[in-house]
Amino acid sequence: MAAAKWLIASLAFASSGLAFTPEDFISAPRRGEAIPDPKGELAVFHVSKYNFDKKDRPSGWNLLNLKNGDISVLTTDSDISEITWLGDGTKIVYVNGTDSVKGGVGIWISDAKNFGNAYKAGSVNGAFSGLKLAKSGDKINFVGYGQSTTKGDLYNEAAAKEAVSSARIYDSLFVRHWDTYVGTQFNAVFSGALTKSGDKYSFDGKLKNLVHPVKYAESPYPPFGGSGDYDLSSDGKTVAFMSKAPELPKANLTTTYIFVVPHDGSRVAEPINKRNGPRTPQGIEGASSSPVFSPDGKRIAYLQMATKNYESDRRVIHIAEVGSNKPVQRIASNWDRSPEVVKWSSDGRTLYVTAEDHATGKLFTLPADARDSHKPAVVKHDGSVSSFYFVGSSKSVLISGNSLWSNALFQVATPGRPNRKLFYANEHDPELKGLGPNDIEPLWVDGARTKIHSWIVKPTGFDKNKVYPLAFLIHGGPQGSWGDSWSTRWNPRVWADQGYVVVAPNPTGSTGFGQKLTDDITNDWGGAPYKDLVKIWEHVRDHIKYIDTDNGIAAGASFGGFMVNWIQGHDLGRKFKALVSHDGTFVGSSKIGTDELFFIEHDFNGTFFEARQNYDRWDCSKPELVAKWSTPQLVIHNDFDFRLSVAEGVGLFNVLQEKGIPSRFLNFPDETHWVTKPENSLVWHQQVLGWINKWSGINKSNPKSIKLSDCPIEVVDHEAHSYFDY
């Protein structure tokens, strides 16, 4: 039992004199969403914790008592990939990755109050996840997803024949997407059933591919699609799933349909919102998401954007009647926020939605028949919402969330009432000890066109009478934001606790502040956003006495990496002691090498060959900009980043080196646009924080701060001189 204690809280990690170290950050327990049982008494959630000594991440499943917040261990079996409630008291269904079928998984059934008596219902001949279940007569129908072969069978990688050649041949896009070369396999939703005999259920191994009959359809859609891309009606008879429009080029357009199909696959799936279809509202042809059946199964709510090539357009709630030819209805269509998830109340009269609002992921409610002018009401909760589930048949919801100061917040929220706290990780995990909301505050500054929001993040033990170097962190996207949420990659608090005050701006292009601010970055990447950042920096310099801008640094990833490269060639670049650019674009024309062409074609108002001047306008490699470079810069780029080729980072480093500017190149051959592997993440932090600490003077003022020499990886240096001797 002692070995499982970290599953309940965590074991203390031996840290340095710094309050919140990269080791603390990486090794802190990570908890998944809490899913309540049908009665609203218990919730189950996944938890894992990285162990630096053993170089592994054991995981397991916990139970959360929804009355008092107590947590208990359900199982420490790391092979269990998911658990869901069977719908019958405290009985559960889980997927076990070790199975008698090579490359397959086992479906097991147990009871949350007596887990040891689990039994195997059957096997699935391939990787399979995302279970959703519903009773249908004497059976329990389910859906989940896996990869499909071109024939429609569930793909089993372990059983696949080895190809005679490594060649890849393409006649259409995508060639590669995010971090993967696209192959002939594709994601598909499969249906099956658990049959009851006596007091046990069994599965015969038979699955029906509901997506394959629609040529060129795919669901869930990669790289981030999951179980939220499909739903099963409460009677288990009908399935809804999301797929990109099969007839349109997927790399160029974002148009997405919601398909409806019988659970048994007796008919081919049909879209309810086909572009220019008789039911689809006029002019609505963008990305769809979050399909969910009403409790009676007669309606489907989903979200959809209007623009066909814009991934950051505003989502609007839509409701369609199942099996009807009536036009799809738009709900609260004038609301200037972009909902992300929608669910029905148990009586089908109210919709609960999450949406980003002023840098916080909030929960809202609105009537299911709300007029266009209706403004949804906020449900009180702490931090940002990651997911939510109804507690029994009540109006209360169990929220799984996080914030800038805690990586897990479990709470119960009820419209019109204060939230009820169940478990906040920063109050339990030793690694997060000392983190709290008091060190976080918003900052509003007049920007290029409107007021711009930023977060100020202070270090542990902050003293307003002392002065701290500025860490100016620029988010990616560009249509994204620094939210009141926990990041497992770029975490402002880790930076702050090296001895900085972090300012994390949300300039033009950011989401959650109204669609106009998001849209205004179009064809203006280095325009208004750069001016916003200059104004924020000037405000900090002139008005916040405890921030030292003379010894500040700037860093960013993706669009933030581009902006750091842009800053290097402009006046603001001379205001920083050091720069860090992670996966940022360098040469304007290289953007054509990206995967999702709709992104660049929207943001630069045309194709690469028709609007070349727009791509060149924001080219960081222009000779007149490169001539101004002088600030020491760390460049990071990874081999499996197929959004922005690693050649971008190498080219940037080449120029920095040839100009004699102190610089370093950090590369992970096994990472993507993000760095996610624990040991790589530690090296990333050692290099990034060591770099900025060297140039900002933190290494001198705080001997316990991270130094470049703390990283055990040997540096490749074949030159007779070293910039690091300067």
UniProtKB/Swiss-Prot annotation:
UniProt cross-references to InterPro entries, sorted A to Z: 6-blade_b-propeller_TolB-like, AB_hydrolase_fold, PD40, Peptidase_S9_cat
Sorted UniProt keywords: Aminopeptidase, Glycoprotein, Hydrolase, Protease, Secreted, Serine protease, Signal, Virulence
Main localization category: secreted
Top-level EC class as recorded in UniProt: hydrolase
Signal peptide per UniProt: 1-19
Assigned GO CC terms: extracellular region
Active site: S558, D641, H673
Region of interest called Disordered, as start-end residue ranges on this chain: 269-291
EC number, as in UniProt: 3.4.14.-
One Gene Ontology term from the biological process aspect of the record: proteolysis
Compartment(s) where it occurs, according to its Swiss-Prot or TrEMBL record: Secreted
GO molecular function: aminopeptidase activity; serine-type endopeptidase activity
Keyword Hydrolase attributed: yes
Sites carrying sugar chains: N96, N252, N605, N699
Protein purpose: Extracellular dipeptidyl-peptidase which removes N-terminal dipeptides sequentially from polypeptides having unsubstituted N-termini. Contributes to pathogenicity.
Family membership noted in the UniProt record: Belongs to the peptidase S9C family.
Protein name as it appears in the record: Dipeptidyl-peptidase 5
Organism: Trichophyton tonsurans
Gene: DPP5
